[in-house]
Amino acid sequence: MKHLITGGSGFLGNLIAHRLLASGEEVRILDIWEDPSRPPEIEFVRCDVRDATGVGNAMRGIDIVHHNAALVPLTKSGKDFARVNIDGSRIVAEQAAGRVRAFIHMSSSAVYGSPACPITAETPYRPIEIYGRAKLAGELAVREVCEKHGTALTVIRPRTILGPGRLGIFQILFEWIAAGQNIFVIGDGNVKFQFVHAGDLIDAYMLALRLGKPGIYNVGAARFGTLREALENLVCHAHSTSRVRSLPAGPAIRTLRALDFLGLSPLAPWHYLTYHKPFYFDVNALLQLGWRPRYSNDDMFRESYDWFLANRRAAGAAKDGSPHRRRVREGVLWLLKKIA
């Protein structure tokens, strides 16, 4: 079969493309940025998802669409969140309608906001910031189009992703730990907090694809503890002199919101409004389907940190492409190093 991956040059889309290629599938990527390391066997189409004509042309001969193109919280894109994550998603779904066998939509845990845990597919949607609201509206737009045209729809909602090559805000965390700088949590950090390894996520993704069973799949680690435990265990693994320090939740959130508004911090509302609260999925439904995740929170943090150290120079030089695959500026967060 032939697959079209929107956002296929991004961190996750790139992994999906390589896994499909390794499985003997034909792959076409649609993205505004071309990864220079893209294998020649993977076809590339330079196109914005808001370009209906270009997207329609890219659909020719496609059996399955994998919609991963999106603006992520780190981009702080304001009104463009709606233009890309909502309007762009609708355009991709409309251009796929009546032409493909199935549509797989990459959603986000941000659609839930900050609900009671564990989170299931039945948990109400209550996004609390601009990114989550745009992702939810985009998902609902895709669902509306797919239902209207009878397109089989699978929705994947991952927890925060870790793994080799994942940079973004994790690059700041890893640099601080490597330098022995103290790291900070909002509140005491003693909240159950789930991540997901990119490899486990792709395994779940491919399982859903193979089963051909439309529906919603929430994907997160099966083994995890608190956020503080994950960070303290990583510091121990790194043999670092860093310490995990607590910031009072109220003042910290107000300060980070002001810095965000002024464009002085890389942290977006999704980060500072949720990382001090419990957040984890119930993944029993996936386990019953045969999904076998390999990584705990601690495992994935260790592997990601070790990859970062081994590839630090190249990772620091990356300036183009997905925000999750390149360096992020600290902004005024560097001041925390001075006062810690």
Predicted feature descriptions by range:
Residues A208-A268, R302-E303, R312-D320, W334-A340:
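Mid/C-terminal beta-alpha module of Rossmann-like enzyme folds, strongest
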